[in-house]
């Protein structure tokens, strides 16, 4: 008699990933302002780099707004420039 193989069902990679929480919604922020340094710091790494939207869970439009606000705040010397590589 031949042994019967058990079929293993693979789970898709998308089923394993849980959806990222939108950090702006979690903070209760509706408009992004370059003067709101406390909120903008949550989107910076410890080296001062802007975090990707895959990390922050932002929409593409929100990510562009956050990036622009961070760049404006850097120009006004409210936030530090990115650190050494």
Curated annotation (Swiss-Prot):
Keywords noted in UniProt: Ribonucleoprotein, Ribosomal protein, RNA-binding, rRNA-binding
Molecular function per GO: small ribosomal subunit rRNA binding; structural constituent of ribosome
Domain of life: Bacteria
GO BP terms, alphabetized: translation
One of the Pfam families matching this protein, by short name: Ribosomal_S18
Transmembrane segments: none
Disulfide bond positions: none
GO cellular component terms given for this protein: cytosolic small ribosomal subunit
Function text: Binds as a heterodimer with protein bS6 to the central domain of the 16S rRNA, where it helps stabilize the platform of the 30S subunit.
Oligomeric and partner information: Part of the 30S ribosomal subunit. Forms a tight heterodimer with protein bS6.
Family in the record: Belongs to the bacterial ribosomal protein bS18 family.
Protein name: Small ribosomal subunit protein bS18A
Organism: Mycolicibacterium smegmatis (strain ATCC 700084 / mc(2)155)
